[in-house]
UniProtKB/Swiss-Prot annotation:
Catalytic activity from the UniProt record: 2 (2R)-3-phosphoglycerate + 2 H(+) = D-ribulose 1,5-bisphosphate + CO2 + H2O; D-ribulose 1,5-bisphosphate + O2 = 2-phosphoglycolate + (2R)-3-phosphoglycerate + 2 H(+)
Keyword Protein biosynthesis attached: no
Name the UniProt record assigns to this protein: Ribulose bisphosphate carboxylase large chain
Annotated GO CC locations: chloroplast
Gene that encodes it: rbcL
Other facts noted in the record for this chain: The basic functional RuBisCO is composed of a large chain homodimer in a 'head-to-tail' conformation. In form I RuBisCO this homodimer is arranged in a barrel-like tetramer with the small subunits forming a tetrameric 'cap' on each end of the 'barrel'.
UniProt-listed Enzyme Commission number(s): 4.1.1.39
Length: 435
């Protein structure tokens, strides 16, 4: 007699375990599953658990050489989504042993690597992940975090101000540096390379770094404040990226920048380690995020990408504005802003937070509001994001009819006014424009 029956078998026999008690060390995932017509939700949920952990479509004899019960992902709870036809939230628990320590790359390859192309599913979205302390402790996390950054910059009790230098492509290095200087001199804390400024024929990276450093030091000398410019170190290879970060450190500037999704988590984590070892702050841009997170029923929600970045490492990350030109709902955005900044975040479904998350004092990340905002949004932004944030106005600074320094000054004045009014107990939402 044979040891097992060959043939295709239902996933739910092995991978749907509604009685399972989740462990403190499990990585928990919440998926929004839209099964194909005729596929029961239990089978779809079990299929997700199987395909993203130990499963294959049939029993193989090598299954006998390991303990499936120890290593398999388990679908432990399913709930229908209110107001949606044939859509379910499926909860899956993964044993910690399935993941390499300190590798966001491996975590994602395991959890979302294969399962999204699965035939039994019409659509699949990863809504949230619970990262247990046992796993988050294997990551360095942000190079410095919010508190250390404030100490380095000597700026307290208010949001920081930034500005992306526009036109994003086409300026020469010297003119670029001039724009940087004018904005910093006018009162901003930071200026920023656009995410697609790397090292193009009209402006090579080394020239840009040099002129921006000059602009920073000149503005610092004249204002008596610490200034920075996010020098984009993103490059075609990890080696080239590190080379750029090394040059930035040699110039003595305070901060570099990386596009973490296009650059990849492996490169990002390498850069974050370099930044902590060498005292550089790291600004993270989320170019490509909407490709992954914009569809409501398929992809990965940005709060998961934000959690992954906090593990991989970054001191700032773009997180939507609630008020500008790009999409983002207020409560949901505030949910993942808290996930970035706070130590303990309680489960709260109204804000899209499916699991309580405990970060064990992994440093926090400053959320960056950027994209189509200008000075009249300031009261709203100050109220929504609070002190620990970076507010970035690109066109909102350089678009000032009198030029960059007045544009920068206007933003700074507005910010100081809003913060002062708030501290004096006025209601920003109501009285913002008079302030």
């Amino acid at each position: 007699s044979v040891g097992f029956k060959a043939g295709v078998k239902d996933y739910k026999l092995t991978y749907y375990t509604p009685d399972y008690q989740t462990l403190d060390t499990d990585i928990l995932a919440a998926f929004r599953v839209t099964p194909q017509p005729g596929v029961p939700p239990e089978e779809a949920g079990a299929a997700v658990a199987a395909e993203s952990s130990t499963g294959t479509w049939t029993t193989v004899w090598t299954d006998g050489l390991t303990s499936l019960d120890r290593y398999k992902g388990r679908c432990y709870h399913i709930e229908p989504v209110a107001g949606e036809d044939n859509q379910y939230i499926v909860y899956v628990a993964y044993p910690l042993d399935l993941f390499e320590e300190g590798s966001v790359t491996n975590m994602f390859t395991s959890i979302v690597g294969n399962v999204f192309g699965f035939k039994a599913l019409r659509a699949l979205r990863l809504e949230d992940l619970r990262i247990p302390p046992a796993y988050s402790k294997t990551f360095q996390g942000p190079p410095h975090g919010i508190q250390v950054e404030r100490d380095k910059l000597n700026k307290y009790g208010r949001p920081l101000l930034g500005c992306t230098i526009k036109p994003k492509l086409g300026l020469s290095a010297k003119n670029y540096g001039r724009a940087v200087y004018e904005c910093l001199r006018g009162g901003l804390d930071f200026t920023k390379d656009d995410e697609n400024v790397n090292s193009q024929p009209f402006m090579r990276w080394r020239d840009r770094f040099l002129f921006c450093a000059e602009a920073i030091f000149k503005a610092q000398a004249e204002t008596g404040e610490i200034k920075g410019h996010y020098l984009n170190a993103t490059a075609g290879t990890c080696e080239e990226m590190i080379k750029r970060a090394v040059f930035a450190r040699e110039l003595g500037v305070p901060i570099v920048m990386h596009d973490y999704l296009t650059g990849g988590f492996t490169a990002n984590t390498s850069l974050a380690h370099y930044c902590r070892d060498n005292g550089l702050l790291l600004h993270i841009h989320r170019a490509m995020h909407a490709v992954i997170d914009r569809q409501k029923n398929h992809g990965i929600h940005f709060r998961v990408l934000a959690k992954a970045l906090r593990l991989s490492g970054g001191d700032h990350i773009h997180s939507g504005t609630v008020v500008g030109k790009l999409e983002g709902e207020r409560d949901i955005t505030l949910g993942f802003v808290d996930l970035l900044r706070d130590d303990v975040i309680e489960k709260d479904r109204s804000r899209g937070i499916y699991f309580s998350q405990f970060w064990v004092s992994l440093p926090g990340v400053l959320p960056v509001a950027s994209g189509g905002i200008h000075v009249w949004h300031m009261p709203a932004l100050t109220e929504i994001f609070g002190d620990d944030s970076v507010l970035q106005f690109g066109g909102g600074t350089l678009g000032h009819p009198w030029g960059n320094p007045p544009g920068a000054a206007a933003n700074r004045v507005a910010l100081e006014a809003c913060v002062q009014a708030r501290n004096e107990g006025q209601d920003l939402a109501r009285e913002g424009n008079e302030i």
